[in-house]
């Protein structure tokens, strides 16, 4: 009997491995139903505040930045908000790609073949800054002149990063074939590498940008970089794990403000700037002061 159980377990493991290799981990049906039920026919231009949502079109192999400002002036860029949310969450290997289309009053259509926005902008901060900096050029002012950096405040909230130091090595990767780059011991190395690199480079460039204008305090990045276990995984939505993530967030507020070292790329605590909680309070005060200033002519 023990031999049969062992064979059964082995067969189950092999079947599970091939199912992960040959298709997405989830079918996405529940997520799509939930988003459509909650958002209904609400379109992108109807959002209550300005939004910038990245996704990636695998048919044209280029990023698509959904923006409510663009949506107000171009019907083909005004999809249902549910379609946008499904698109930007369609993470390769986890959820299936998503196709939808928009139609304007002239009968013209645009077909979108979308996957997760993280493919193009895992950290969308730079995409948001770009939209704001050119906002006055699309007939919808963001109340900021292009590149008026000293009046631009950027709060970037990361969703957490796993402690990956030592996870992969060149010695090990040198022996990998195509399959191992996609799947290795439950991880997806190629996805991990591209997503982390994308996010880190954005933080590096945005940090450099504000420091070059001597207004580094206008950019506040809050990110936990030491996650491990289930809280480091992107698809564990159990009540227990969500409570753990809440505690991680509370602890993060108590940690010192950190900023990326432009030489090493590592986050380092900044002397004299207090905790993240104190920095958020100060940031709110700065925002309040900015709101009181007269609009740029």
Q: Where are the language model's segments positioned?
A:
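Conserved catalytic cores and adjacent C-terminal regulatory segments
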Residues: 1-297
